Amino acid sequence: MKRRSSFQGLPLACIAISAIIVFGCFDKPSGSTKGAVPGPIKVFSAEKGGYIMSETVTKSNEEWKKILTPEQYHILREKGTEKAYSGIYASSHEKGTYRCAGCGLDLYRSADKFESGTGWPSFTKPIAPENIITRPDNSFFMRRTEVICRRCEGHLGHVFDDGPKPTGLRYCMNSAALQFVATGK
């Protein structure tokens, strides 16, 4: 009579665990916002100079593709990153507000923008903490903190802890994820 080893299923278990670890390290592109919880959210409006209630923006991938450029769609909906120094706002010094290119939510003020030397527009803080969401991003075997738009859940960029005073933070954004509105317009 053959003895069955208690380790017989071990190779299969190791393969399953390895697959979970490997594929768990790659965040899947969100694309559609159909999973977003619709409803009113409290956000800051630069135009109003205070907090307002706003509805979340929920669209299908097809709807997003109709209103965004291919580059904007890749960055906002598929968590892409534009090439360093290729974005129109990397070296911009004009005064105004940077909004989400997907839904128009106010995100950053030019007064909080600084030259980080990275090739992407960088800010020390958002216009209001309520206007963004941060979450862990472990894609490509890196540990980062992703920044997304609170209203449409579009990927904006990442935040790092190597920024200047007073916050010590560097909100490194993609130009294609932003829309600039000059002061007085």
Predicted features along the sequence, with ranges:
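Short, contiguous pre-domain boundary segments
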Residues: G39-S60
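N-terminal export leaders
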Residues: R3-Q8
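Bacterial signal peptide processing site
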Residues: F26-K28
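A short Gly-Trp-Pro
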Residues: T56, K65-I67, K79-R99, L105-K185
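C-terminal motif of bacterial Sec signal peptides marking the signal peptidase cleavage site
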Residues: I21-G24
